[in-house]
C-alpha cells in the first residue's frame, strides 16, 4: 500500500519543493484549501480532503479534517490486529505523514487594529487536533510543523526509504511544544481581554532567540528566550549593529541599564556593572550627560555597560572610545559615531527603542518550586503626594538632585542608598543588610562630592543613624519613603543639621 501524506499549511515556505520530494518517493499527498490550490498551480497532483472524508468542507472551512477517516488513519496502531481490522472494515487508509502549521493567531493579534472577532477566527481547531493525533502515534506517523525540518525528512526518505524513529520522536516533541505555545498565546490573549489579573493557572511561552556560550559562570549552560509580545524597548528585541555575541551577563546588565535610562526624559546616560548603576548623568545633550556619568565613578565604569536615551553623536563616541566598555545601547548612532566605535571589534553596539514600561508589564521571578508574578515597579514620583516634615525645603538644585537620586535608587539592590550632586550620581551603596551600611559605602565612594549632595533611600530609616552619617558627610537633602515608627527621630536629626528631608510615601525595594 502506498504511503500517504496530509499537507495543510498556513506558512507556505518551501512546501512546493517538499511535496515534490514526497511525490518523487511515491507518497500520495492529500491536501486542503489554499495549500491544495498552490500545489496544483505548481503542477503537483494531490488528493482533495473531501475525497478522503466523503464529506465537503463546511462552515467556511471550520470543519474539514475533523473526521474518522482522517483521525482513524492517524491514530491507528499499525501492529494492533484489532485496529487494522477496524480500518479495513470501515475503509480507513493509514496516513503516514502530516505536514501542518497552524492558523496565524500570533500574527493576527499583533496587528494594531485587530478585532476580537478576527482573533477568534484565527484560532485553529482542526490543525492542532491533527498534529496532536499524529504526534501521539509518532511510532508510525511523521509529523512536521516547521519548514526547517523539511530537508531532514526528505534526506532520510531518500537514504532509508523511511524516517528514523529518533527523528519521529524529535518531531513529535516539537509538535507538543508547538501546540502548548499556541494554546498559551490564546489563553493569555483571552485572559487579558477579560481583565483577569491573577488567574488560577499561568501559562507562559517564550521563543528561543539564541544559545549562549555559558551562563553567569562558565560551568553553567544558558539560553536566551524572548517573549512573543515583549516591548520593542527591550534587550530581547534590540538590534546588534556590531561586536561580539552577547553573553548571559551582558544581557542582564543591558536590561538593568535600559530600565534605569527609561526613567529620564532629558538626555541621560547610565553606566551599569553587575546589574547596579555605577554612574548616571543628565545634561543639556548626550555628550554632557555621558561626561557626568563617567565622572560619577571613573573607576567602576571600566568594563561596564552604557545606555543612552538619545542618539550617540561623534563627540560622545570619541569619549566612549577612550575606555574599555562591553556594550553601548542607544536609540541610534550617527554614521560618524559608528565609524569611531566600530574600530573596536569586540564592542557591542545595540539600538533599541527607549520607552518606559507600563504597570501592565509583568515581572516573573523563578523561585525553587514556583514562580512569583508582580507588576513592574514603574511608579514615578508624585510631587502632589509628597510631604516635607523638616523646617527647611529643598532648593531648586537640591530638588533636581533629589529627583535624580530617587529615579535611580529604585533600580539598586536593597538596602539601597544613592547620592546625587550637580545632575549626576556620586555614590551608590547597594545590597547591604543594614541601611546605614549602604549609606557609608555611598558616602565613601562619593568622597568630597558628598558635600552638598542629595541622598535617596529606597525604604524608610528605622533609626536616625543614616541621617547622622549624611550630616557628617555634608549631605544637605534627603528623600525617603517615611513611615517608620521612629520618623520623628530622623526629622529632629535632620533639623538639627539643617538638612531638608522629603517623604514620598512610596517604598522601592529591589531584591
Curated annotation (Swiss-Prot):
* All residue ranges annotated as the MGS-like domain in the record: 1-145
Domain of life here?
Answer: Bacteria
Report the transmembrane regions from the record: none
Q: What is its EC number?
A: 2.1.2.3, 3.5.4.10
Q: Name one GO cellular component term.
A: cytosol
Query: Which Gene Ontology molecular function entries are recorded, alphabetically?
Result: IMP cyclohydrolase activity; phosphoribosylaminoimidazolecarboxamide formyltransferase activity
Pathway assignment: Purine metabolism; IMP biosynthesis via de novo pathway; 5-formamido-1-(5-phospho-D-ribosyl)imidazole-4-carboxamide from 5-amino-1-(5-phospho-D-ribosyl)imidazole-4-carboxamide (10-formyl THF route): step 1/1; Purine metabolism; IMP biosynthesis via de novo pathway; IMP from 5-formamido-1-(5-phospho-D-ribosyl)imidazole-4-carboxamide: step 1/1
InterPro entries in the record:
AICAR_Tfase_dup_dom_sf (IPR024051), Cytidine_deaminase-like (IPR016193), MGS-like_dom (IPR011607), MGS-like_dom_sf (IPR036914), PurH-like (IPR002695)
Which positions are tagged coiled coil? none
Q: Which Pfam families match?
A: AICARFT_IMPCHas, MGS
Transferase is among the record's keywords? yes
Q: Which SUPFAM superfamilies match?
A: Cytidine deaminase-like, Methylglyoxal synthase-like
Instruction: Alphabetically list the UniProt keywords.
Output: Hydrolase, Multifunctional enzyme, Purine biosynthesis, Transferase
User: Known PANTHER family for this protein?
Assistant: BIFUNCTIONAL PURINE BIOSYNTHESIS PROTEIN ATIC, BIFUNCTIONAL PURINE BIOSYNTHESIS PROTEIN PURH
What is the similarity comment for this entry? Answer: Belongs to the PurH family.
Q: What is known of its domains?
A: The IMP cyclohydrolase activity resides in the N-terminal region.
Q: What is this protein called?
A: Bifunctional purine biosynthesis protein PurH
State the encoding gene.
purH
